[in-house]
Design a protein with these regions (language model features):
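Short loop/turn motifs that connect adjacent beta-strands in outer-membrane beta-barrel proteins
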Residues: 20-31, 65, 103-111, 168-174, ...
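Residues that define the transmembrane beta-barrel architecture of outer-membrane proteins
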Residues: 31, 50-54, 89-93, 110, ...
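Short glycine/proline- and aromatic-enriched beta-strand/turn motifs that initiate or cap beta-hairpins
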Residues: 19-61, 218-229
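Transmembrane beta-strands of outer-membrane beta-barrel pores
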Residues: 39-43, 72-78, 99-101, 118-124, ...
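Glycine- and aromatic-enriched membrane insertion/assembly motifs of diderm outer-membrane
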Residues: 46-103
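Extracellular/periplasm-exposed beta-strand and loop segments of Gram-negative cell-envelope proteins
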Residues: 45, 73, 77-90, 123-134, ...
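Outer-membrane beta-barrel "beta-signal"
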Residues: 94, 98, 208-231
């Protein structure tokens, strides 16, 4: 009888230890929405007097490693060189997702991710002047100063993104991302080209590819917590 009692207590102790280990291997991970701004636009305004812009960014944690993401903003850029002078002003929106490839330890919510954005922009150009060049160096170049407006222009493009977000304080994140952009379509004005697209940046002739960097700060709004197995 004593043997059965001892065996019973040993079994209870083993189950208790196993349950405690299982409990210790589980922690709660925060699910919520992050909202913030792209600081690279503010930095750019300090270094480029002819540029104005602001971008609001956000994401929502849908699954353990999957985040739905959005960006929206406005930009205004004045460009003047030896050939022409023009202004571009418009707004844009980007929608996509990020996938976190980083396995966090307990109480860490950092991200190293790959993602994509499908982007669209609406904008206007104001052509201030342009120069007609002549191969004959004996005559001055013909500069035409005639303001002309090109309205209701548009462009769409795709972005492939590599980046990270680090939780520097509780629910406060700093991030960096590299963007590879591919222009998909655009509505161009008559007798002019889209040399600058808000949200995409400069558009080069016969080249629909662009590159960009973002520096972000975001604040998380916790919605709920979900159990996760400790690594």
């Amino acid at each position: 009888m004593l043997r059965y009692i001892i065996s019973f207590f040993i079994l209870i102790n083993v189950i208790s230890v196993f349950s405690q280990e299982e409990k210790d291997s589980i922690f709660k991970s925060t699910y919520g929405m992050k909202i913030g701004i792209d600081l690279s636009k503010q930095i750019r305004m300090l270094t480029e007097p002819d540029y104005k812009g602001i971008v609001v960014i956000g994401d929502y944690r849908l699954l353990d490693k999957l985040f739905l993401a959005f960006e929206m903003g406005t930009e205004e850029k004045f460009i003047e060189n030896e050939v022409l002078s023009f202004n571009t002003k418009g707004s844009f929106i980007k929608i996509g997702a990020n996938y976190n490839v980083f396995n966090n330890f307990e109480n860490l919510e950092n991200e190293i991710y790959v993602g994509f954005r499908v982007s669209s922009s609406k904008f206007d150009h104001q052509l201030n002047s342009f120069t007609i060049y002549s191969k004959d160096q004996y005559w001055n170049q013909n500069k035409i100063e005639n303001t002309e407006f090109f309205k209701d222009l548009s462009a769409t493009w795709f972005e492939l993104i590599f980046g990270f977000n680090a939780e520097v304080f509780n629910n406060t994140y700093m991030g960096l991302s590299l963007r590879l952009k591919r222009l998909l379509s655009q509505k161009e004005p008559t007798n002019f080209r889209n040399l600058y697209v808000p949200g995409f940046n400069k558009v080069l002739e016969n080249n629909k590819v662009g590159v960009g960097l973002t520096y972000t700060v975001q604040f998380q709004i916790p919605i709920y917590k979900k159990k996760k197995i400790k690594i």
